[in-house]
């Protein structure tokens, strides 16, 4: 517990345990990508948390699949900021830097990651692994370092951003009770 005069006491947080619990209990995280203007572009992504428990491996990481028929995710730089949410409240819990690796198709590592993702993919139709092999990208996001935000150290702003226009968020037809059809 650390105390500064005039501020409430802050209890030390075991970030490793908190990350493992938050990542294993949630299926969505946010990825912040620099957009060139200085303001980050934030993408909500479905992921699977996986730890191969191999001491020679990369350690626990978030596996993300994107591409045709899957979630949209732009090309990611070598390092991004990830925001993990609390399963209980849905609010941000941890904000960490993460290294990004793109897995090469046809490698044993890609095949293993595809199987981990396939097992957790809801409402999958057909052979998703074959579809991913044709046109999807599998990335491994490995969080590291001290968190930018954690319990007791949150930034003051809310983090709200307008929804980016996309096929899933843009409405063309609205029901009449939502100011959609003309009255006449």
Give the ranges of each region predicted by the language model.
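Extreme N-terminal tail/first-helix region
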Residues: 1-28, 160, 164-165, 172-174, ...
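Short beta-strand segments
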Residues: 26-68, 74, 80-84, 94-96
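Short amphipathic alpha-helical segments and helix-helix/interface helices
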Residues: 19-20, 70-74, 114, 129
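Short amphipathic alpha-helical surface micro-motifs
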Residues: 10-14, 75-84, 118-125, 129, ...
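A generic local structural motif
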Residues: 15-17, 42, 69, 126-127
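Charged, gly/pro-rich active-site loop segments
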Residues: 89-184
């Amino acid at each position: 517990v650390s105390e500064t005069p005039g501020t409430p006491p802050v209890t030390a947080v075991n970030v490793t345990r908190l990350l493992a619990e938050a990542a294993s209990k949630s299926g969505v995280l946010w990825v912040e990508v620099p957009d060139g203007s200085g303001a980050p572009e934030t993408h909500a992504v479905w992921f699977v948390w996986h730890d191969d428990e191999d001491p020679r491996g990369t350690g626990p990481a978030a596996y993300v699949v994107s591409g045709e028929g899957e979630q949209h995710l732009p090309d990611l730089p070598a390092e991004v900021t990830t925001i993990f949410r609390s399963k209980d409240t849905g609010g941000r819990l941890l904000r960490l830097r993460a290294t990004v690796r793109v897995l090469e198709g046809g490698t044993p590592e890609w095949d293993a990651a595809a199987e981990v993702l396939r097992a957790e993919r809801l409402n999958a139709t057909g052979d998703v692994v074959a579809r991913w092999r044709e046109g999807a990208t599998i990335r491994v996001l490995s969080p590291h370092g001290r968190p930018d935000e954690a319990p007791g150290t949150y930034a003051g702003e809310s983090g709200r951003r307008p929804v980016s226009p996309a096929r899933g968020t843009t409405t063309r037809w609205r029901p009449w009770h939502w100011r959609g059809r003309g009255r006449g």
